[in-house]
């Protein structure tokens, strides 16, 4: 019984507090003195109430533009949007800031946060990486402009992770052709991947998958095309062995190599 009464009292108190808070915010937002709204916005920001802070910052931004307070309002608004996870809004706000206040002591941080907001908006590796490419370019531009920045390590990490996502997506796309049994397209895609990512962790697997793709292509080819394509399997197998003599894929690749060798030998015997 006491517990129920305590629960009801607690709920009632919570409702009163929320109602009071909303009422206070409404009074502040309707104040004709922008300084009242400005100080309240800073207070909400300090308390990590970024939603209310952003509403007040946006409200007074046209009024304070050109005043000393205007710089802080536009800068903090970017962070409010970032913490609210509206990353594209944040990136646009930070970009506007450093373009408008290029000589500000906060311009460097705003430039970094512009790129970091783009990076934060980029999806996982299995989805389209257009935003990731834009974020990587933006962060590289930041490092070019501020090579000794205190954000240098974080910027380099963003580029590294973004590059990793692009690499992962590129590998998935290339392997998809093999899954779809589009073997010639798979081989071309694997070659393009190696050119684009010469230091990739997937190069060994790609060398093996090229053998798989070429072997399947030969198997499905017209009889007249098979000798040349089986010889290509043999060449790709040799490349795999030369590049990765301890590869875990060698046993499986060797089976395709042996079958291809037998097919080529068989064709020669028939010809003779």
Residue ranges, per PLM feature:
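Acidic, polar-rich low-complexity tracts and alpha-helical solenoid repeat scaffolds
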Residues: 2-6, 18-272
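Sec-dependent N-terminal signal peptides
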Residues: 9-17
